[in-house]
Amino acid sequence: MDTQSFKTFNAKPDEVERDWYVVDATNQVVGRLASQIARVLRGKHKPTFTPHVDTGDYVIVVNADKARFTGKKEKQKEYHEYSGYPGGDHSHSPEEMRADKPTYIIREAVEGMLPTGPLGRDTFKKLKVYAGPDHPHEAQQPEPLDNA
C-alpha cells in the first residue's frame, strides 16, 4: 500500500504560487461578492490550502462604487467609527460612504470575512480595490474570477 497518498499536505510559505484575479463589482451584491473574494484571498479554492499558511491569491476589484445592497440596506445600514474622544462617535450610511470613500464598502465587507490576527492582516494586503474601471496592475496579467 502506498503510504504517501495518506499523508496530509502542508504548504510552505516559500513554495506558494500566487495568481492575480480581477473582479468587476458592477451590480454585484456586496456580501456575496465579498465572500467569494475572501475565499480566493485565503486560498480555500486551491487543493494546496493550509490553514496556518497564507496560500491565497491577489484579487483586484474594479468598479467598487457600483456594487449594490439588497433590500433597504442602502439607506438603513450604518457604518460606525469612533475617534476616541468624547462625542467622537459617528455613523454613516452606505450612500455617504460611497460618496466619500467609494472603496470602503467592499474593503470593510471583505475584511470582516477574514481571520483576525497576523495571518488575516497579511491576507487582506493582497486585496486591491478601485472605484473606477482602471487599475495599475496590468503587468501582472490578472485573469477574470469565474464565480464572482
UniProtKB/Swiss-Prot annotation:
Asked if Ribonucleoprotein is a keyword of the record, the answer is yes
Q: Which UniProt keywords apply?
A: Ribonucleoprotein, Ribosomal protein
A Pfam family the protein falls into: Ribosomal_L13
Annotated CDD domains: Ribosomal_L13
State the Gene Ontology terms under molecular function.
Answer: mRNA binding; structural constituent of ribosome
Q: Which residue ranges are recorded for the region named Disordered?
A: 71-99, 125-148
Q: Could you provide one GO biological process annotation from this protein's UniProt record? A: negative regulation of translation
- Compositionally biased spans, kind Basic and acidic residues: 71-81, 89-99
Q: List the GO cellular component terms.
A: cytosolic large ribosomal subunit
Q: To which protein family does this belong?
A: Belongs to the universal ribosomal protein uL13 family.
Job of this protein: This protein is one of the early assembly proteins of the 50S ribosomal subunit, although it is not seen to bind rRNA by itself. It is important during the early stages of 50S assembly.
- Its quaternary structure? Part of the 50S ribosomal subunit.
* Name of the protein this chain belongs to: Large ribosomal subunit protein uL13
Q: Gene that codes for this? A: rplM
